[in-house]
């Protein structure tokens, strides 16, 4: 941890960009940071570990485990879609940060007659946390400005009915700018694919906003 403090900000951002653009198994990040004790310098990531989730929806475990599966899925999607360096970085950082709001919002609530773990409101809360984190590690603003609205809207598809109006799609596009709906759908796919043993798939609701 002491060695980290001697690194210039440019080196930190360079290493994170390398992780986002080139890593085949980016999900190893949490384990690596924990083993090196550098995790203490990234509380936004550190706080994800141990945060419980409803096992009905998240059989893979806590938020930290889920996030590492999501970034691995995002890397596969980026390769499949042949994304350029910046587009891949946006997807990977959005995947890493998408649940940054969960540690502060997770609590037991009664749902359908049972006590379940919920994290209502974690999406809008996560946006500013993602911006703070990415800015602190030196990621350029053109990437940060796309990641933040993706984090804040990554559950939008759950709020749509069977029919989505053009007006609703236009409003979503405005909320996402400068990111795009197409980018958001890739994040939604990565998020849904980060819940093993559930199958990797794009939720049907997400297809309706395209």
Positions of PLM-derived features:
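Glycine- and charge-enriched loop/helix tracts that form the active or gating conduit
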Residues: 1-88, 92, 100-121, 125-142, ...
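Acidic active-site catalytic centers that drive phospho-/nucleotidyl reactions
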Residues: 98-99, 191
